[in-house]
């Protein structure tokens, strides 16, 4: 922040000039409780600082006699995470009026603004990328990143007049609240789209999606069946992890898929002899069922295999199903198996041992459902994919909008601390930014008051 680029009436000063750093309460582990009792005070720790506010759901409590009066959080304080194993945590801040008496631990500190400095202005400054980047560069430690009190001597903050500080803080309160509201609404959309996709699949497998095609609400041509009647061949995957003879074949693992979509680039290849190659080779539209997984949400899920033209096999974490293509489409089967009643049946068919969830071929073949004619299956698949493509387009637009919104906060903060949000206000209020109201005069007042009190910087030492 170059002094030559400052607006009229502004100045720059180290953060330590316009605030006093209060160090946190030191206590032993055995002195802390996880519940409140008489003569104890709640303690804010670094993990309680979230998104500029205090998360008070996981507080510890220490005896009041360990807490000095100066260490109690005041409404003006900006509490800072002073020490953390993560650079993304160290330096983060919270400024919030608490409804109860509270203090903060030794891994935190509080910036207490001077008399002529707006606490809200300082709080917004600690959200800026300029501040965060400076903190990141100044924090040091082998395993733990620490901010030293002297670090605040090295972080300069642009200072306008007190009146302008308050105007800037008010504008930021309004603008950033609007950004947060927009972000919150955008973040809800993926869940809405998830429910939309689930509703589409429910309509697909119940026949609702193709009522108009049948010209009837009755499921004409649909019949009850089980999966075993539609399977031509089933096989557990290859157990060995290496081979000595034969052709080198890609053996697919669960790591080669994400959300049932193929990931290219990190496949494992194993040499298979001709007998093994014949047994474990995949064909287009085969179904791979996740046979075993630590997650019950993943075990038993169906993945439609699409051939890339190469011979590929599959490992023993999968069961391969080869379907009768004259009776059922593989894509339609994934709709049946991965949502609703089909998924409920398969999940309840899992057996659990040593933290692993497993499903067997017998349980898979026992999956029962209503099967429409092949022509109607094709129409269902077409409509589902069309609706899913629509949802995917919306989701992509939402993600792009979220990226822009996330950058908007820093853009607004940067404009604020360059004086761009208050240019018109300064033009309309020259008396409030000049002479005795200028930032330079304000800093002189702070300097004079500190001289009289013996220098408040000494308060930065461990309280």
Curated annotation (Swiss-Prot):
GO BP of this protein: DNA restriction-modification system
Pfam families per record: Methylase_S
Keyword DNA-binding annotated: yes
Keywords: DNA-binding, Restriction system
Recorded GO MF terms: DNA binding
Keyword Glycoprotein: no
CDD domains: RMtype1_S_EcoKI-TRD1-CR1_like, RMtype1_S_StySPI-TRD2-CR2_like
Function field: The specificity (S) subunit of a type I restriction enzyme; this subunit dictates DNA sequence specificity. In the presence of the R subunit the complex can also act as an endonuclease, binding to the same target sequence but cutting the DNA some distance from this site. Whether the DNA is cut or modified depends on the methylation state of the target sequence. When the target site is unmodified, the DNA is cut.
Family (UniProt): Belongs to the type-I restriction system S methylase family.
Additional remarks: Type I restriction and modification enzymes are complex, multifunctional systems which require ATP, S-adenosyl methionine and Mg(2+) as cofactors and, in addition to their endonucleolytic and methylase activities, are potent DNA-dependent ATPases.
Domain notes: Contains two DNA recognition domains, each specifying recognition of one of the two defined components of the target sequence. The recognition domains can be exchanged between different S proteins, generating enzymes that have new sequence specificities.
Assembly and oligomerization: The type I restriction/modification system is composed of three polypeptides R, M and S; the restriction enzyme has stoichiometry R(2)M(2)S(1) while the methyltransferase is M(2)S(1).
Name the UniProt record assigns to this protein: Type I restriction enzyme StySPI specificity subunit
UniProt source species: Salmonella potsdam
């Amino acid at each position: 922040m170059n002094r030559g680029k400052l607006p009229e009436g502004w100045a720059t000063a180290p953060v330590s000039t316009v605030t006093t750093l209060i160090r946190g309460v030191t206590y032993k582990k055995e002195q802390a409780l996880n519940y409140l009792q008489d003569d104890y005070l709640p303690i804010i720790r670094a993990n309680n600082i979230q998104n500029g506010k205090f998360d008070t759901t996981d507080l510890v409590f220490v005896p009041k006699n360990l807490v000095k009066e100066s260490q109690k959080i005041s409404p003006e304080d900006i509490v800072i995470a002073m020490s953390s194993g993560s650079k993304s945590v160290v330096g983060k801040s919270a400024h919030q009026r608490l409804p109860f008496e509270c203090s903060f631990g030794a891994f935190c500190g509080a910036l207490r603004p001077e008399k002529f400095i707006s606490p809200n202005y300082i709080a917004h400054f600690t959200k800026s990328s300029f501040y965060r980047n400076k903190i990141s560069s100044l924090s040091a430690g082998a395993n733990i990143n620490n901010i030293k009190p002297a670090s605040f001597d090295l972080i300069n903050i642009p200072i306008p007049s007190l009146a302008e500080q308050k105007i800037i803080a008010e504008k930021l309160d309004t603008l950033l609240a609007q950004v947060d509201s927009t972000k919150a609404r955008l973040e809800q959309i993926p869940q809405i789209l998830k429910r939309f996709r689930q509703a589409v699949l429910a309509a697909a497998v119940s026949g609702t999606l193709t009522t108009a095609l049948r010209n009837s609400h009755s499921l004409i041509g649909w019949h009850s069946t089980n999966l075993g009647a539609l399977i031509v061949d089933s096989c557990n995957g290859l157990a060995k992890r290496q081979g000595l003879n034969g052709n080198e074949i890609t053996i697919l693992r669960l790591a080669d898929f994400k959300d049932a979509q193929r990931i290219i680039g990190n496949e494992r290849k194993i040499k298979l002899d001709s007998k093994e190659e014949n047994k474990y080779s995949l064909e287009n539209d085969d179904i791979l069922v996740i046979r075993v997984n630590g997650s019950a949400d993943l075990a038993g899920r169906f993945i439609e295999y699409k051939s890339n033209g190469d011979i590929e096999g599959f490992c023993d974490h999968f069961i391969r199903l080869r379907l009768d293509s004259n009776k059922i489409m593989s894509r339609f089967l994934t709709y049946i198996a991965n949502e609703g009643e089909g998924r409920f049946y398969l999940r309840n068919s899992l057996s659990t041992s040593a933290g692993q969830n497993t499903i067997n071929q017998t349980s898979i073949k026992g999956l029962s459902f209503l099967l429409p004619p092949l022509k109607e299956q094709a129409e269902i698949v077409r409509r589902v994919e069309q609706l899913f493509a629509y949802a995917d387009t919306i989701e992509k637009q939402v993600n792009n909008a979220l990226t822009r919104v996330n950058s908007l906060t820093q853009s607004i903060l940067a404009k604020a601390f360059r004086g761009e949000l208050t240019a018109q206000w300064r033009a309309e209020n020259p008396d409030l930014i000049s002479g005795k109201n200028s930032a330079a005069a304000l800093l002189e007042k702070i300097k004079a008051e500190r001289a009289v009190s013996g220098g408040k910087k000494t308060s930065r030492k461990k309280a």
